[in-house]
Design a protein with these regions (language model features):
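Alpha-helical membrane segments and immediately flanking helix-loop junctions
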Residues: 1, 126-166, 173-212
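Entry/N-cap segments of selected transmembrane alpha helices
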Residues: 1-7, 42, 88-114, 124, ...
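Hydrophobic core segments of alpha-helical transmembrane domains in multi-pass membrane transport
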Residues: 2-15, 42-55, 73-80, 171-172, ...
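Interfacial helix-loop-helix linkers and transmembrane-helix boundary segments
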Residues: 19-25, 35, 59-66, 83-100, ...
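Cytoplasmic-side transmembrane-helix entry/capping segments in multi-pass membrane proteins
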Residues: 38, 67-68, 92-104, 127-133, ...
Length: 233
């Protein structure tokens, strides 16, 4: 919560002092109530899916890895939309606002990790390591389990997984006025799991920001996690 809070404050300040241009791809501007409904729909879909998986696990035996293939198809169609709207791959990867959002996000994550370490009376390097996952729970949990054991690995897993869950609410609610906050709070998932949600909430024009931001937040976690977890406590 401390790391997420630091991200929110830092990214909202960035949005306030460096506001993005008004969205052009949305013909009708969504009201706050409509955005809240969209957030609840996304969260409700996750809850219903989880319940169905639990209640009907004997009947709903989906092929292993099908979620990955569905995600690949969704991202494939996002790529088609980018090209159809005249946005090149270079523009998507080297987007200035996306890169700046990634820097602000990384700095506030590490700052939040330091604050969390003081509040929870843990070593600073451990707080920095937990902050370095940036939403990449499948990576952070493995690295920190190998470094410090299953308890710390589980903490890293739930810490980063909670970011993805919070994103379901934040993206639709903040996209209109706090674009970098809406995208930045997703962390490393901006380039894969939450990319279709970002595109739906903000239109195709915000996709380059998400992709550029996602590249930053996918390159740094492996380096930072290994570095901080290798420092003796």
């Amino acid at each position: 919560a401390i790391i997420l809070g630091a991200n929110m404050i830092g990214l909202m300040l960035y949005d306030l002092f460096n506001p993005a241009e008004p969205l052009k791809s949305q013909g009708k501007i969504d009201s706050r109530w409509h955005s809240l409904i969209d957030s609840l729909k996304l969260f409700g879909t996750v809850v219903i899916g989880t319940l169905c998986g639990f209640l009907f696990k004997s009947y709903l035996m989906l092929p292993t890895g099908i979620n990955l293939y569905v995600l690949i198809v969704l991202i494939f169609f996002v790529g088609i939309q980018l090209r159809n709207n005249g946005i090149s791959l270079k523009e998507a990867i080297f987007n200035k606002r996306g890169f700046q959002t990634g820097i602000v996000f990384t700095f506030t994550s590490l700052l939040g990790g330091i604050i969390a370490a003081f509040v929870l009376a843990m070593p600073i390097t451990q707080g920095l390591a937990f902050a370095s996952g940036m939403g990449w729970y499948s990576l952070s949990s493995v690295v920190l389990t190998n470094a410090w054991g299953p308890v710390q690995g589980s903490i890293a897993f739930f810490n980063d997984l909670s970011r993805e869950i919070v994103s379901l609410f934040v993206i639709p609610l903040f996209m209109r006025h706090f674009r970098s906050t809406a995208i930045g709070i997703t962390g490393a998932t901006a380039i894969d799991c939450t990319l279709p949600i970002i595109q739906k909430a903000g239109g195709i024009e915000v996709t380059p920001i998400a992709i550029s931001f996602g590249f930053v937040t996918n390159i740094l976690p492996p380096l930072l996690l290994v570095f901080f977890s290798s420092i003796p406590l």
